[in-house]
């Protein structure tokens, strides 16, 4: 597994039994993950979750908040800032497992000021923001969801 030391404020505490337990800044979130098919390694940690996502049998799901969390907060990658906000579909707006890919993107672009990037299905703009931070001439962000495009603009603005 590739891992990036450049993502700050996020780490995986434990995973297993089709769930993952993650630290997102000051908060611990418990979310479903169908790929975590092994047994939990640290069962004593799971009760420490500040929020738990429960799947609905009819699709989607809901968050159970064990303590009051803000609607949004921030995590950092290198010197960039990204918004985190639990959504109705278990997501948080950032896929931290992509940080190794962000490292790759930055490393490939940092010495190419004439480069141009087209980021399709770009979600909340983490990769777009990383590409722009490499100092290239143009980055185009495309996502079908207007809400995600707005979220990407917010991440861009947080990182400038």
Task: Describe each PLM feature range.
Residues 7-22, 29-96, 103:
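Non-catalytic substrate-recognition/targeting regions of SAM-dependent transferases
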Residues 96-103, 107, 150:
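Short, contiguous clusters of charged residues that form electrostatic/catalytic patches at enzyme active sites
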Residues 27-28, 138:
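Structural motif
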Residues 1-4:
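N-terminal accessory targeting/assembly segments
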Residues 107-160:
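Conserved SAM/SAH cofactor-binding pocket of Class I
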């Amino acid at each position: 597994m590739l891992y990036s030391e450049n993502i700050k404020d996020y780490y995986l505490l434990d995973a297993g039994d089709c769930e993952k337990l993650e630290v997102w800044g000051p908060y611990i979130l418990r979310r479903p993950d169908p790929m975590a098919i092994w047994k939990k390694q640290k069962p004593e940690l799971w009760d420490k979750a500040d929020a738990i996502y429960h799947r609905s049998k009819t699709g989607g799901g809901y968050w159970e908040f064990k303590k009051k969390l803000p609607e949004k907060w921030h995590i950092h990658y290198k010197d960039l800032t990204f918004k985190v906000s639990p959504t109705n579909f278990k997501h948080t707006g950032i896929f931290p497992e992509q940080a190794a890919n962000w490292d790759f993107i930055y490393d490939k672009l940092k010495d190419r000021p004439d480069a141009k990037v087209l980021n399709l299905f770009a979600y909340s703009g983490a990769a777009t923001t990383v590409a722009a931070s490499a100092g290239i001439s143009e980055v185009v962000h495309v996502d079908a969801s207007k809400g995600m495009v707005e979220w990407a603009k917010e991440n861009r603005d947080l990182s400038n």
